[in-house]
Each structure stands twice: as C-alpha cells, then as structure tokens.
C-alpha cells in the first residue's frame, strides 16, 4: 500500500439551480433560571454534532448529515464572506492532487461537522501521516480524533477573539501543502463541470460532481506517470 504524506481537508461551495428548502423553526428550548440548578433538578445538556459522531458508526454519521439545498455562507481565502444557494462539497485530497473521499451536504453545514466521517472514509482507503485543516476545523475534539487514527493533526488555530497560536516553523512548512485542496477545488469547478450544474436534487448533484472528480483523478494520475 502506498504511503501518503498529507491529506488536505476542505469544504467548497456548490451553487445549484434550485430554490433553497425553507428551514423549519427550531423548537423553543425551556429556559432555566440563572445560576446553579436546584437540588434534585436535572438540566439536559445538548450534545454537539462532533461529540455525537464519536459514538456513531460511519453509516449513521453520513445519514444524519443535512442534504437539502439551502443557503450557505463561507469566508474565502481573502477573508471576505460569500453566500450562495445550493450545497457544499467536502473533500479529502492527497498531496499528489488526487481526491480520496467526498461528501455532499447542505450549503449551511459547517465544515467541522463533516471532518469525522470524512476522516474515517479516508482511513479505510489510504495510509497517510498528516491531516491538514484550516481554522474552520479548529477543535480539540478533532485533534484528538486525528491522533486516535494515528495521524498528526495540523489545524490552523482559530483565536476566537483571543491570541492566535502560530505553527512551529516545521509545521508551517508542512501546512503549505494544504494549498493542494484549493487547487483541486478550483480545477473541479473550472475544468470538470463543478460550476455548471444542470440537475437538481442531492443525488443527481452528487452524481454530476463524482463524474467530474473521476475525470479529474484520471487526468491527475496520468500527469503523475508521464
């Protein structure tokens, strides 16, 4: 089995020609008084998506991901926010430029909520050393998960109003490999139909994108062997 150095993980906007599904209003949560709970009072704590995924098999994780067309917002490489109607494609790309795993979700799904299922899919297919992710994936839970799989997590730190923690020099050099994810996203959209959807619905959109990824992978494979 070939050993891959780095897997770059990223989510990219997929614009669709369909109306976004109206989101249902969340159920009103019961409000509690401030302060400590009374003696004998039990307050339910809502589990985060990543915490729930840690206890689920892969099939359940993937099935639970929202897949309807809706509206998404994402910061681009320059720090500006872009919004779109459609979906979001989440990719794991090897440092040779070949996509290894892909999942398509609603546009509004946060990148970090797809990291665990993507990582498990990729771990079944290839052996690699480093997981490279941007600040959207900054989470101690995801770092710990990466280590449990035997990988070294290199995740850009999100200061969230605090002080940013930079990479060590050798980590920063390795993290530069993550530009491969952006190049693959760009090639899929510019050269392999990712920007030109003529179909509607999650299943058909995913099929369209997978044909593009298949062609991209074949071309990249030939480039590596010329």
Where are these regions (language model features)?
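Polybasic low-complexity intrinsically disordered regions
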Residues: 1-135, 140-148
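Short glycine-rich loop/turn motifs that provide flexible caps or phosphate-binding loops at active sites
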Residues: 85, 96, 181, 200, ...
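Catalytic-loop motifs flanking and including active-site residues across diverse enzymes
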Residues: 114, 180, 184, 207-210
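Hydrophobic alpha-helical segments
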Residues: 125, 184-187, 191-195, 217, ...
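Helix-centered, glycine/charged polyanion-binding patches within enzymatic domains
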Residues: 30, 135-203
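Charge-patterned, long linear interaction tracts outside catalytic cores
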Residues: 200-226
């Amino acid at each position: 089995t070939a050993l891959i150095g780095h897997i770059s993980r990223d989510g990219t906007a997929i614009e669709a020609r369909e109306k976004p599904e109206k989101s249902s209003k969340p159920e009103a949560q019961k409000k509690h008084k401030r302060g400590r709970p009374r003696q004998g009072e039990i307050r339910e704590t809502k589990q985060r998506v990543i915490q729930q995924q840690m206890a689920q098999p892969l099939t359940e994780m993937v099935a639970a991901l929202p897949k309807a067309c809706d509206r998404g917002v994402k910061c681009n490489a320059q720090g500006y926010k872009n919004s779109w109607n459609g979906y979001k494609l989440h990719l794991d790309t090897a440092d040779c430029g070949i996509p290894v795993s892909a999942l398509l979700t609603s546009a509004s799904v946060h990148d970090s909520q797809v990291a665990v299922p993507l990582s498990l899919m990729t771990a079944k297919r290839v052996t690699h050393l480093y997981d490279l992710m941007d600040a959207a994936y900054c989470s101690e839970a995801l770092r710990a998960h990466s280590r449990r799989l035997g990988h070294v997590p290199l995740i850009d730190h999100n200061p969230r109003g605090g002080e940013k923690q930079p990479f060590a020099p050798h980590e920063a050099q390795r993290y530069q490999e993550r530009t491969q994810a952006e190049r693959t996203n760009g090639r899929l959209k510019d050269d392999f139909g990712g920007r030109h959807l003529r179909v509607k619905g999650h299943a058909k959109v995913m099929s369209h994108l997978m044909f593009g990824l298949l062609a991209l992978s074949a071309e990249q494979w030939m480039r590596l062997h010329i």
